[in-house]
Amino acid sequence: MVRLSCAGARFGSYLDEKHLFTWAEEIPCFDHWDGDTLVLRSKEISDADLRDLLALFSRYRIPMQQLAQFKTDANRHWFTAPSTYWFLEVFKVDDLSSGQD
């Protein structure tokens, strides 16, 4: 299981908050909520699930660096593309310059 902290998510209203939980529960790799922690079944998730997590985390301003752990050889070509809206949030400059790959 993989635990992703959603602490500090920003909501515009009660329904906005409710939609975060509903949206996450619709992602196939979702297992359960543990307070404000999103728990996934496995670190091995589909490209579609990863794209949904990227959108969800971006929408609610949840720290996106924790999504870097889902980088694989298979998704590297699109997931680590510098032109994407998530690149700077997921792969901070420190991560790239430290030689981590």
Model-derived regions, located:
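Extreme N-terminal starter segment of soluble prokaryotic enzymes
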Residues: 1-3
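A structural detector for beta-sheet-dominated domains
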Residues: 5-7, 41, 65
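Short, surface-exposed ligand-recognition loops at beta-strand->loop->(often short) alpha-helix junctions
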Residues: 6-15
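Short, acidic/polar
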Residues: 16-21
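Short acidic amphipathic segments
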Residues: 24-34
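Residue-level detector of family-conserved "landmark" positions at structurally sensitive sites
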Residues: 34-35, 67
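A generic structural motif
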Residues: 36-44
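Helix-rich interaction surfaces within compact, conserved domain-sized segments
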Residues: 44-101
